[in-house]
UniProtKB/Swiss-Prot annotation:
Keywords (A to Z) from UniProt: Antenna complex, Cell membrane, Membrane, Transmembrane, Transmembrane helix
Ranges per topology, Periplasmic: 57-62, 130-142, 203-209, 282-302, 356-358, 416-436
Name of the gene this protein is made from: pucC
Keyword field contains Transmembrane helix: yes
The protein's role, per its UniProt record: PucC is required for high-level transcription of the puc operon.
This protein's name: Protein PucC
Pfam families: PUCC (PF03209)
Superkingdom in the source lineage: Bacteria
UniProt keyword Calcium present: no
Length: 461
């Protein structure tokens, strides 16, 4: 027990110096409790890395699944993103015999995650025609894989929306943006750590190892999410009785009130445009580095770490200035950092010397802008929403962000491939289509800034 107390004391003393947003901890809600709660973001990071990174490559290369079919499967989780607003509202108004609001929804999402991961490896092997499944009807593998990805996506959206709402319930209103920022920092950590673990486990790929890794992720998701929500919400019979008698508006009424708040529609439009531009960049940076700058697979993989470092720097900067009273909409113009970033990325393929360094600088700048933009718009959304509808506001923010990012990822590949297919437009070079897409992204971000200007003039929070 003495060692545990010593470790917790040193964690509370030193973490604020090195971990962004760690200063949100207090005597009532110590950092150890917040970090334990953030384990749900670790499982979300594991899932995102497994789907978008590891399985993306395994399905195309090792399992020889057509790339178009892989894209459809990876887009399945996006179908559930618009429902995050409803999830947030349901967790705000949930009625429980134990007086719990968020924990039941986190558990529901965990079950969805587990179910999807449990059937996913076998569905993918059937989809690829592995072994005796080569004679199975094609629709069986496609249907099972689609169901697996849809279940996992639904689980991730439910867990993240309810988990973030629970995090905001634990702290004072002025600290809510900071605690959500801390949760997103842990999401980035989860993505980086899980990428290293998955890479090591699947270094020598076999179908059996694929089954072990995916089902191990299913088990880890259950264990970590249970640890995250354990004793975070206090059981209260009195609160349960209040829940039974409390009158709540319908979802339509609550959503209408939220959208009727001054500036909310314009704010969500800015979020959609800015995140859409980010989504288009996310899917093309690594192939651009390989084809335009001739970077190796190992070198392009490190772009993820550089990108995450820039995002962390943006989150940390936004946390510091917003904590000192700065207006979030002014800092949401952090997407202006991404416009020069895209210019640097485009120029990196057009100069003969030091192009790689310019590309790396542009990648970091894009990550920095994303961190500033994401935290500032999240803070603005929470400040605009009513105090008793934080879950609904977080759901709306998450729904817009996830949907816009998914559409950006899908459209970037389509536009790039369409430009490549145009005869004689770019000659035999591979750089032109990429640079055109990056230029489109920069224009979209400029439009986002234009939509943010009226919010700045209004002088809102």
């Amino acid at each position: 027990m003495g060692y545990r107390a010593f470790a917790l004391k040193n964690l509370a003393r030193h973490a604020p110096k090195y971990l962004p947003f760690a200063d949100v901890a207090s005597e009532e809600v110590p950092l150890s409790r917040l970090l334990r709660l953030s384990l749900f973001q670790i499982t979300v990071g594991m899932t995102l890395t497994l789907l978008a990174g590891t399985l993306n490559r395994v399905m195309i290369v090792e399992l020889a699944v057509p790339a178009s079919l892989v894209s459809v499967m990876l887009a399945m989780p996006m179908l559930f993103a618009p429902f995050r607003t409803l999830i947030g509202f349901k967790s705000d108004t949930h009625k429980s015999a134990l007086g719990l609001r968020r924990a039941p929804w986190i558990w529901k999402g965990t079950i969805y995650q587990f179910g999807g991961f449990a059937i996913m490896p076998f569905a993918l092997l059937v989809l690829s025609g592995f072994g005796e499944s080569v004679d199975a009807p094609r629709w069986i593998g496609m249907s099972a894989a689609a169901l697996a990805f849809l279940l996992v996506g639904a689980g991730v959206h439910i867990v993240q929306t309810a988990g973030l709402a629970l995090a905001t319930d634990l702290v004072a209103e002025e600290d809510q943006p900071k605690v959500v920022g801390l949760m997103y920092v842990m999401l980035l950590f989860g993505m980086v750590i899980s990428a290293l673990v998955y890479g090591a486990l699947l270094a020598d790929y076999t179908p059996g190892r694929l089954i072990q890794v995916i089902q191990g992720t299913a088990l880890a998701s259950v264990v970590l999410n249970m640890a995250a929500m354990w004793k975070q919400e206090a059981v209260s019979r009195d609160r349960a009785r209040q829940m039974e008698t409390a009158e709540h508006p319908t979802f339509k009424e609550a959503f209408g009130l939220l959208m009727g708040r001054p500036g909310m529609l314009a704010l969500l439009t800015v979020i959609a445009l800015g995140t859409f531009g980010f989504g288009m960049a996310d899917v093309l940076l690594e192939p651009y580095g390989g084809q335009a700058l001739h970077l190796t697979v190992g070198e392009t993989t490190k772009l993820t770490a550089l990108f995450a470092l820039g995002t962390l720097a943006g989150f940390g900067t936004a946390s510091r200035v917003l904590g000192n009273g700065a207006r979030p909409m002014r800092w949401s113009a952090g997407c202006t950092d991404r416009v020069p970033g895209f210019v640097a990325i485009i120029m990196s393929s057009l100069i003969s010397q030091d192009g790689i360094w310019l590309f790396l600088a542009g990648t970091f700048a894009v990550g920095l802008g994303i961190g500033l933009f994401g935290h500032a718009t999240l803070t603005a959304t929470m400040r605009t929403a009513p105090a008793d509808r934080i879950g609904l506001a977080l759901g709306a923010w998450g729904a817009v962000q996830a949907t816009a990012a998914g559409l950006g990822v899908a459209l970037a590949g389509v536009v790039r491939d369409g430009l490549v297919a145009l005869p004689g437009t770019f000659g035999s070079g591979v750089v032109g289509p990429y640079n055109t897409v990056f230029a489109i992204e920069a224009l979209i971000l400029i439009v986002a800034i234009a939509f943010a200007v009226p919010l700045l003039k209004r002088g809102g929070r």
